[in-house]
Structure formats: structure tokens, C-alpha cells
Regions:
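Histidine-centered catalytic/metal-binding microenvironments
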Residues: 418-498
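Bacterial N-terminal signal peptides
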Residues: 8-17
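Accessory, solvent-exposed terminal regions and/or long lumenal/extracellular loops of proteins
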Residues: 260-327, 331-336, 425-445
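Sec/Tat signal peptide C-region and signal peptidase I cleavage site
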Residues: 18-22
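A contiguous strand-loop segment
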Residues: 23-138, 158-285, 289, 294-295
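Short, well-structured alpha-helical segments that form the helix of a local strand-helix-strand
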Residues: 155-164, 303-307
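Bacterial N-terminal signal peptides that target proteins for export
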Residues: 1-8
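Substrate-recognition/cap regions that form aromatic- and gly/pro-loop-enriched pockets
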Residues: 316-445
Length: 498
């Protein structure tokens, strides 16, 4: 029996855990949210075994030398000078390299989420290729920028300078957020890029494709490489006389049949969630609005729901649909190979220790639980800094991933058990969290040290409770799976007694 169970799990993992890189990103302006906060959601998708670790990088003084990707077994041989005085910052990083921090804040309250893998036109990459050997990639962006950037705009400017001088090692989109502004950065080719400030009363969604259209030189709402428009004109991907206003996506971004089934549907689905009256077809990706005012103000819960989406309730549902012809046509947001997803929330009116919070779900969001990780945290419970690409009994990543792998052997039967338990946990946690934050603010005004102690006690208790629940659910699902396997093997025995 044990052999059949393991074989089933391995086969399912092979099917669901492909190596394709993909992410989905959502940004929400403060006047588009229900409480005046700025919100960022992103899924990080690659390999299901890509265990993550939670890191707190201490402030550093009088540094010399270089940051080296190669020294950490990173993507290439990118190097960059270390800042003389580096700020404290956090990342959720690759367990193997301790690089590729998916999300984090620094002590100045500036946050970053990256990257969104995007693709440029082949004809332009032949002229201005990615610098794959020594250009900057998602492996190094957080560890270069977070210790030194004091605002979102400064982060955009610095990354742009690096792309223009050292080159991008790949195509990417990056989110920058601070107390006042929310920016999205996209590469075009190896040395071309633009960035746009997100309108306060609108939201933006992207899925593995360049999505920024407008770009205006000398406009404070935009930044970009100095010759980004001229390069497109010179290489005949933009003709002002014929095309009218410059469109960065149209000029620089790959757009073909792959995007129709892989990328467009995710953008369309999120926009339909937040703007139900909007009527558009999955295939009309180039017509989707870039920025939209939501029909109702958006919350953290709305973004969690988007990160968990898989065309729920339709024939295209990747996991629950009975229509085998339509079930896997379109790529869902929540996929098994997601190794983490997060929702960043910035509330400038609160002390930054709790005003900057990231809700993180490890593994597949649809079968995981979102926990709040405050910027004021000084540590984690055991297992958060452990992990590798091999399953173990210590890593917090594998606590969640083991349960998800079991559930995917029979999603229809086992997923309701997990989803109902996690929904109940999150609902109860929201009540506890509101009470904690109220207590924290009152205590912060009198005694910051005691307030920070309260923050860490609450956070670590939450981590432990979620871990305990997950282990209970793993045992419950494993018991169900064992009983199912027993029944299956007995039926194969044609009613004969063992």
C-alpha cells in the first residue's frame, strides 16, 4: 500500500510541478482599497520543491567589497558594490542560495516584490540582448536594492541605472512601495525599461507579459531609459505617424498564441473578479484595460481570493472541472508549483512595525493559509530558516507542501477538508489580529519595547498554531488516503480474503 501511495504522489508531482517560470501580480492604489492602504499581491511560481526560508538581514556598517551572485550559487556572475552602510531588511528567499528574495521591506519602510517574468520581442533581443552572464536578475534585485533604497522612486531609479549600465540578465517586472507611492517597473530588452506610478484610485494586474502601455518623458508619473522611445522607432517596432501615442507593451513585448492561453486568462479573470460588469473575452488580451477602478473598494481578502483562483466554478477549473476537454486549457493563478504567494499591505498611519505587513501563503495558495508577518518581527519559530529541495521534518515550507501534495492525489475529495479548516482559521485570526493591533498601538505610545514584545509573541503564537493545524490536517488526509487505498486494493482482490 505504501508503495502505491508514494508512486501516486510522485506521479502527481511530476505532472503538476513543471519548471516553467510564471507569476501573477496585482497592485492596488490607496484610494482603491477599502481602508486607505496600498496593496500588492504576487504569486511566485517555479518548482514545487523550491523550499523557501524567511530571513532577517541585519543593518551593516562600514562595508567594503562586492555583492556576488556567483558566490551564493546564484543565477549568473552579476556583481555590485555593497553599500557602505546597509539598512536592515527582510526577504523570503530560496533555501539553496539564500538569494531570490520574493518579497521584503527595509527599515525605511520601503518594500519590494519581484519578479514577474516577462518576455520581449525576439527581433529586439537580437539587437539588445539580455546580459545573461553578468546582468542583474531576480536572484539579486532584493539584496542589492533593499539595503540602500530610501523610497520607492529611488529603488526604481537605481534598478533602471543598473539595467542601463550592466544590463538585465532576463526580462522582469518589479513592484516598489513606500508610505506614499506605488510603482511598477518593466524591462523591455537588455538595457531598456520603463516604470509607472500606479494611480491612487485604480488597480493593475499582470501575468507574465509586459502590461505597461503609456510612457511620457519628463512626466513625474513615469520613469524610463533615456532612449526607450527612440530605440523602438529606430528598430521599426514603433511608428509615431502610424501608431500614434507610444505604447511600451506593443513596441517591446512578445505577444503570440502562448499568451492567449497562458497569460491573458489570468488578467481577465482578476479583472472580472474586481469589475464583474466588465465584459471581455480571454483572447482579447491587448484590449484589456491597463488600470481599472474597482467596482467596490478592495481588501486584503480580495487579493487573497485572487491568488487562490483557478477559474473556480467554471468548465475551465484546473482542478474541479468535470469537462476534461476544457479543464486545462487555461493556466490558473493558483498552481501546484507556486512556492509562495503574498499580499503586502502598507498603512502609513500606523507605526511601521505593524503598518508594513505581508500575508504569506507557502506553496499552493488554494491549499494554504495566509499568515501576517509584520515588519517589526525579530525572529520566527523553529523551521522558518531551514529547508532544502529535499523534503524533511523540520522546514516550515515542507510542513505545508506535504499536505498539499497529499491533497492533490484526490483534489475533489480532500481539498474541502483543508480549505474549510484554513478558512475558519483565517476568519478567527482576523479577529485576534484586529484586537492585537489595537493593543499594540496603545502600548506603542507608552512603551515601544513592550509593544514590540507583544508583536513578537502574537506573531510566533500564530505561526505555531498554523503549523499545528497543518500537521493535524496532514494526518487527517493521510488517514483518509490510507482508507481509500485499502478499499481500492481490496476491490482489486475480487472479494477474496487476504
Amino acid at each position: 500500500m505504501k508503495g502505491e501511495i508514494l508512486a501516486s504522489i510522485v506521479a502527481m508531482s511530476a505532472i503538476l510541478g513543471t519548471s516553467s517560470l510564471a507569476c501573477t501580480t496585482i497592485l492596488v492604489g490607496d484610494k482603491a482599497s477599502n481602508d486607505g492602504s496600498m496593496l500588492v499581491a504576487r504569486s511566485a511560481d517555479s518548482k514545487a520543491i523550491k523550499a523557501q526560508v524567511f530571513l532577517i538581514h541585519p543593518a551593516m556598517k562600514n562595508q567594503t567589497g562586492m555583492h556576488s551572485s556567483k558566490a551564493h550559487d546564484g543565477a549568473n556572475d552579476f556583481t555590485y558594490p555593497l553599500p557602505k552602510d546597509g539598512m536592515r531588511y527582510t526577504t523570503i528567499a530560496n533555501s539553496h542560495t539564500k538569494l531570490h528574495g520574493a518579497v521584503g521591506y527595509n527599515e525605511a519602510g520601503v518594500g519590494l516584490s519581484g519578479t514577474e517574468t516577462i518576455y520581449a520581442k525576439d527581433e529586439l533581443l537580437k539587437i539588445d540582448p539580455y546580459n545573461e552572464e553578468t546582468g542583474i536578475t531576480e536572484d539579486d534585485i532584493p539584496d542589492v536594492l533593499l539595503p540602500r533604497m530610501k523610497s520607492a522612486k529611488e529603488g526604481v531609479k537605481l534598478l533602471g541605472e543598473i539595467v542601463e549600465t550592466k544590463g538585465a540578465g532576463e526580462g522582469f517586472g518589479v513592484v516598489f512601495i513606500d508610505a506614499n507611492e506605488l510603482w511598477y517597473f518593466e524591462t523591455g530588452t537588455g538595457h531598456k525599461w520603463i516604470a509607472s506610478k500606479i494611480p491612487q484610485d485604480e488597480y493593475f494586474v499582470t501575468a507574465n507579459q509586459g502590461r505597461l502601455h503609456a510612457y511620457k518623458e519628463n512626466d513625474p508619473n513615469f520613469m524610463g531609459a533615456k532612449d526607450v522611445i527612440k530605440f523602438a522607432i529606430d528598430n521599426k517596432t514603433y511608428d509615431p505617424a502610424k501608431d500614434g501615442e507610444f505604447n511600451f507593451t506593443k513596441a517591446y513585448t512578445r505577444d503570440d498564441e502562448r499568451d492567449v492561453t497562458y497569460n491573458y486568462p489570468r488578467v481577465c479573470w482578476v479583472q472580472s473578479m474586481f469589475n464583474p460588469s466588465l465584459k471581455q473575452d480571454f483572447a482579447d488580451g491587448q484590449k484589456f484595460p491597463v488600470f481599472l477602478k474597482p467596482e467596490k473598494k478592495l481588501s486584503v481578502e480580495d487579493l487573497k481570493a485572487a491568488m487562490r483562483a483557478h477559474y473556480d466554478g467554471t468548465a475551465f477549473d484546473n482542478y474541479a472541472s468535470k469537462d476534461e476537454d476544457k479543464k486545462n486549457i487555461y493556466r490558473a493563478i493558483s498552481v501546484f508549483r507556486t512556492y509562495e504567494s503574498h499580499v503586502m499591505q502598507v498603512r502609513p498611519w500606523l507605526p511601521k512595525e505593524i503598518g508594513r505587513v505581508t500575508y504569506v501563503a507557502l506553496g499552493m495558495a488554494d491549499l494554504s493559509v495566509y499568515l501576517p508577518y509584520y515588519e517589526g518581527l525579530d525572529g520566527f519559530i523553529k523551521g522558518y530558516s531551514d529547508g532544502s529541495y529535499d523534503a524533511d521534518d523540520t522546514s516550515i515550507y515542507w510542513v505545508y507542501r506535504k499536505l498539499q501534495t497529499l491533497v492533490m492525489t484526490d483534489y475533489e475529495k480532500y481539498s474541502p477538508v483543508v480549505k474549510e479548516a484554513y478558512a475558519k482559521f483565517e476568519k478567527e485570526l482576523a479577529v485576534k489580529q484586529a484586537k492585537f493591533e489595537d493593543e499594540y498601538v496603545k502600548l506603542y505610545k507608552k512603551d515601544k519595547k513592550k509593544a514590540d514584545k507583544l508583536l513578537n509573541e502574537f506573531s510566533k503564537k500564530t505561526m505555531q498554531e498554523a503549523k499545528d493545524l497543518t500537521q493535524e490536517l496532514t494526518n487527517k488526509v493521510f488517514t483518509m488516503l490510507t482508507a481509500d487505498m485499502d478499499a481500492k486494493l481490496k476491490s482489486l482482490n475480487k472479494g477474496k480474503k487476504d
